[in-house]
Every structure is written in C-alpha cells, then in structure tokens.
Amino acid sequence: MEFSQKLYQAAKPIINDIYEDDFIQKMLSGDIGADALRHYLKADAAYLKEFTNLYALLIPKMNSMNDVKFLVEQIEFMVEGEVLAHDILAQIVGESYEEIIKTKVWPPSGDHYIKHMYFQAHSRENAIYTIAAMAPCPYIYAELAKRSQSDHKLNREKDTAKWFDFYSTEMDDIINVFEALMNKLAESMSDKELEQVKQVFLESCIHERRFFNMAMTLEQWEFGGKVND
C-alpha cells in the first residue's frame, strides 16, 4: 500500500465524524443558517490567503520544474477558481462574497490550523511535512463531496447541493499531485519519520473538523474577565 493510502485509511474515522457533524449535515439538507455561512466564508477567506502563501513556501523545496509549475497553477486556482464555491454560499446568504469578507475574522480554530501548517513549512526542510499538513484540506473536501453524491439526504432542491458538486470534482488534480509527491518523498524516509508525517496529516484532519464546527458555533476568541457594572 502506498504511503498516501495509509494516510487516507488512518484518516477515515475523522472524516466520518466530520460528515456526521452539524455543518455537513445542515449543508446536505440545505437548512444551514446564514450566520454560520457568513462566519465560514469570513474565516475561510483568511485561511485561503495563508494557504496560498504556503504554496509559495513549498516552491523552493521542489526539485522538479513540473512540480513548481503545478504549484504556481494552484496559487492561481486558490485566488480565482475556488471563489466559485464561495459564491454559491454567498448567494444563499443573499450577499456578495466580496461584501461578506470585508469584515475579517480570525477564529481560534483557523488560527491553530494555519500555525500548524506554517510550523511544518518553516521548521522542516523536507517538503513532505508541509504537504502532509496541507493535503487533508483538498482531500477531505473531496471525500465529503463525493460521499454526498450518493447520499439520499442531499437535497437537490437547495443550492447547497451545488457546493458539494463543485468539490466532488475540482480537488482531484491537487490531490493527485500531493499524493505523488508524498509517495515519492516517503521512499527515502525511515519508519519513525513516516510516523511523524502521519501525525502531521492527522492533526490537520482534526483541524479541518474544528474549522467546520467553528462555523456552527460562530467561534471567536474568548478572553474572559467580563467587567460587571
């Protein structure tokens, strides 16, 4: 079994939990609230900006010009292509995507996720650690979306179905490239090192779950110490 497949197998329980959590279930039924969608879009805009920067940090770690070319293309996709998925949700809210994200949010779950990825990029020379931190994002979105296509709970009368349709196909290219890169880099690594990479991958899966849940709870920083009049 290739290394990437071992990672996917290990991540299955987490992905199952994400699918059963409120965000995806409400998206399937089309009953998700506008406040949750706004919070998700605002937080995701901040997340994707940093995710794009991480592609740029990966480029110097690449040995192949083909890999560099693909990463540059992915930066373009993050800036332009994925906006289509965001527009679907913005239309459900009834506001333009640009208007929604004018108000920035940086919730704890997004903060911790982004810092997890940056730590791998800055502290590990081997690109596999950064890739393992980034790869769960497109993989989980694709897995959730593909599973939805055969789920009777997917309400085709609601526009949220278009969001699932988008992610059921649009992540395939980056998933395939991340797989190939991880499998190639894993060949020269020890079992102990691969276990560390697996840990990085699974931690990102947990961060993905927390990110979706963040939207449902309208998560924000809580510093306590309320002042009583």
From Swiss-Prot:
UniProt keywords, alphabetically: Hydrolase, Thiamine biosynthesis
- Increases nucleophilicity of active site Cys, annotated site positions: 47
Enumerate the residues binding substrate.
44, 141, 167
The EC number of this protein is 3.5.99.2
Instruction: Please write the reaction equations for the catalytic activity of this protein.
Output: 4-amino-5-aminomethyl-2-methylpyrimidine + H2O = 4-amino-5-hydroxymethyl-2-methylpyrimidine + NH4(+); thiamine + H2O = 5-(2-hydroxyethyl)-4-methylthiazole + 4-amino-5-hydroxymethyl-2-methylpyrimidine + H(+)
Q: Tell me, what is an example of a GO biological process annotation in this record?
A: thiamine biosynthetic process
Pathway where it operates: Cofactor biosynthesis; thiamine diphosphate biosynthesis
Q: Which Pfam families match?
A: TENA_THI-4 (PF03070)
Q: Which residues form the active site?
A: 137, 208
Q: Name one GO molecular function term.
A: thiaminase activity
The record ties this protein, via InterPro entries, to:
Haem_Oase-like_multi-hlx (IPR016084), Thiaminase-2/PQQC (IPR004305), Thiaminase_II (IPR027574), Thiamine_Salvage_TenA (IPR050967)
State the GO CC annotations: cytosol
Q: Which family does it belong to?
A: Belongs to the TenA family.
Extract the NCBIfam families matched here.
salvage_TenA
Q: How does it assemble?
A: Homotetramer.
Q: What's the stated role of this polypeptide?
A: Catalyzes an amino-pyrimidine hydrolysis reaction at the C5' of the pyrimidine moiety of thiamine compounds, a reaction that is part of a thiamine salvage pathway. Thus, catalyzes the conversion of 4-amino-5-aminomethyl-2-methylpyrimidine to 4-amino-5-hydroxymethyl-2-methylpyrimidine (HMP). Is also able to catalyze the hydrolytic cleavage of thiamine; however, this thiaminase activity may not be physiologically relevant. Therefore, is probably involved in the regeneration of the thiamine pyrimidine from thiamine degraded products present in the environment, rather than in thiamine degradation.
Q: What is this protein called?
A: Aminopyrimidine aminohydrolase
Q: What is the lineage of its organism?
A: Bacteria, Bacillati, Bacillota, Bacilli, Bacillales
